[in-house]
Regions:
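Basic, glycine/lysine-rich polyanion-binding surfaces/domains
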Residues: 1-195
Length: 197
């Protein structure tokens, strides 16, 4: 899989790397293969997405591709829990991908998949449901507990979602701000990803 030039790579390794990640990330670590990267995220205890990333199995553990601007936030969150496991999180010494995409190509790929990649401006702001992650295989409700899982499960089974992700194209008006208002001046939406093609 190809990533943008804004991504960096981390490694999680150790005899309990799978168990450690299972309690933190939103997908089932038992279903992660070495064939290709899968999208996932970590959430805070309020069920808000701290960051998204892509993960796959490698010989020594798990390789994670993440936006460089959020790698420190990812490490800070994980380092609260990793001391309780025989696991280690470190920078990937072989931090390279098959072919780096430019930002426009990467954004086009994400929009076509219907995935919003969390960045510094959106970190800890949205729930997975507001980003439609439950329909894009970024959440596995059968895997058991993970950080923020109670809040997220409540939204899945009993919640009333006020906002949800939509993809729009052929917009007539030039977007000047990330916030969208109706004619009465009430906020009705927010642009999270935008590409001009």
């Amino acid at each position: 899989m190809n990533f943008s030039e804004k991504h960096t790579s981390l490694i999680v390794q150790g005899s309990q790397a799978t168990e450690f990640l299972q309690g933190q990330i939103t997908i089932d670590t038992e279903k992660i293969s070495n064939e290709d990267f899968k999208p996932a995220c970590i959430c805070n205890n309020k069920g808000r997405v701290i960051t998204t990333f892509w993960i796959k199995k490698v010989e020594i553990g798990f390789k994670i591709a993440i936006l460089e601007e959020l790698s420190a936030s990812f490490e800070e969150h994980m380092n609260k829990y990793i001391p309780f496991f025989d696991a280690e999180l470190k920078n990937d010494d072989q931090d390279h991908f098959k072919k780096e995409l430019d930002s426009t190509e990467w954004m086009k790929f994400l929009i076509n998949k219907g995935i919003v990649e969390i960045n510094k401006n959106t970190s800890s702001k949205f729930t997975p449901h507001e980003l439609n992650y439950q329909n894009n295989e970024l959440i596995d409700f059968s895997k058991g507990c993970f950080n923020g899982q109670e809040v997220i499960a409540r939204m899945e089974y009993r919640g009333n979602l006020k906002f949800a992700l939509k993809i729009a194209d052929n917009l007539q008006d030039e977007i000047k701000d990330s916030l969208i208002y109706n004619k009465e001046g009430k906020k009705v939406g927010e642009v999270l990803s935008l590409i001009h093609i």
